[in-house]
């Protein structure tokens, strides 16, 4: 069973004493790897809409899927025309968000090194809004600035919609583990103060960059790769709630951990029982 964390614009209000069931429920896929409408193939980033509709970057099927709550199959809303770089194709899409202002979905089309926008009312083709970027994670703030992580330059950039260049808001000082550097930034989250949280994948940490600062602070992990409670192992999908608590999917530890604000270690809330397909296990969560 795969597990994914939605990277949402809205902060969630999760009680400090919240508890999670040991077993998870499959809401999309789970019918073995494949390309049928009830299947997924290496799904990665996702977005959950207000009505619980889930948009999934179905990476190795080169498409974006829409799964309405309670349904057993999804619908292709972008791509699905084979791997390629035409306007109606995607190449290993890795993240997706919804822009309600324009009623469109924004896609990190990683294999084509571009960010695409597809109008939800026109599912036949999309338009390129950012080019020449080795994108991984996407999010949007409350002022409709778009944030994109770039593996090639080890930075996160903020873009006004329709802007091509953007502004560096995290990293951008080469590959490394100093507080002003990132090493393969993956998924990102922006809070209401416009602080940027970054899953710093190969540094095995989550970084927080407050607005207009030149370096970040470590808010989870940062003690080398490992599965101890004060460590992370290849952090991926991540979100932050209203209390500043961080929830992060750890790919190589096959778990989701929760780090309270200011804590020196986290606690496991999902998985952590080895790699597997049982309802209480995860398999390389991203």
Regions found by a protein language model. Give the residues of each.
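Blade/loop signatures of beta-propeller domains
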Residues: 2-26, 30
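Beta-strand-rich domains and repeat architectures in extracellular enzymes and scaffolds
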Residues: 10-13, 28-62
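A short beta-strand motif characteristic of beta-propeller blades
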Residues: 26-36, 75-86, 124-129, 168-178, ...
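Beta-rich, blade/repeat-based domains predominating
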Residues: 36-51, 86-102, 131-146, 175-196, ...
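Short loop/turn segments immediately following the C-termini of beta-strands
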Residues: 51, 59, 69, 101, ...
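Residue position within the beta-strands of beta-propeller blades
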Residues: 55-58, 98, 106-109, 147-149, ...
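Structural signal for beta-propeller blades
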Residues: 62-65, 113-116, 154-157, 166, ...
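Short loop/turn segments that connect beta-strands within beta-propeller blades
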Residues: 68-72, 118-123, 160-164, 210-214, ...
């Amino acid at each position: 069973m795969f597990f994914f964390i939605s990277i949402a614009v809205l902060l969630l209000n999760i009680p400090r004493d919240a508890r999670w069931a040991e077993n998870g429920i499959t809401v999309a896929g789970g019918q073995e790897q494949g390309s049928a409408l009830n299947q997924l193939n290496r799904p990665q980033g996702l977005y959950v809409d207000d009505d619980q509709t889930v948009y999934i970057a179905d990476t190795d099927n080169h498409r974006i899927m829409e799964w309405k709550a309670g349904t057993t199959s999804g619908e292709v809303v972008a791509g699905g025309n084979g791997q390629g770089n035409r306007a109606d194709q995607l190449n290993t899409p890795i993240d997706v968000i919804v822009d309600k202002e324009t009623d469109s979905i924004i896609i990190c089309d990683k294999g084509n090194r571009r960010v695409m926008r597809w109008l939800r009312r026109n599912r036949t083709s999309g338009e390129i809004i950012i080019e020449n970027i080795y994108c991984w994670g996407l999010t949007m703030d409350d002022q409709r600035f778009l944030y994109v992580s770039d593996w090639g330059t080890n930075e996160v950039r903020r873009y006004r919609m329709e802007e091509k260049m953007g502004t560096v808001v995290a990293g951008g000082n080469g590959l490394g583990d100093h507080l002003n550097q990132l090493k393969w930034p993956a998924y990102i989250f922006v809070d209401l103060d416009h602080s940027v949280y970054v899953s710093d994948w190969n540094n095995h940490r989550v970084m927080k960059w407050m607005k207009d600062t030149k370096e970040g602070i470590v808010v989870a992990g940062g003690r080398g790769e490992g599965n101890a409670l004060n460590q992370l192992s290849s952090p991926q999908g991540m979100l932050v709630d209203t209390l500043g608590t961080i929830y992060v999917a750890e790919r190589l530890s096959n778990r989701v951990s929760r780090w309270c604000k200011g804590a020196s270690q986290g606690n496991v809330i999902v998985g952590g029982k080895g790699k597997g397909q049982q309802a209480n296990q995860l398999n390389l969560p991203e």
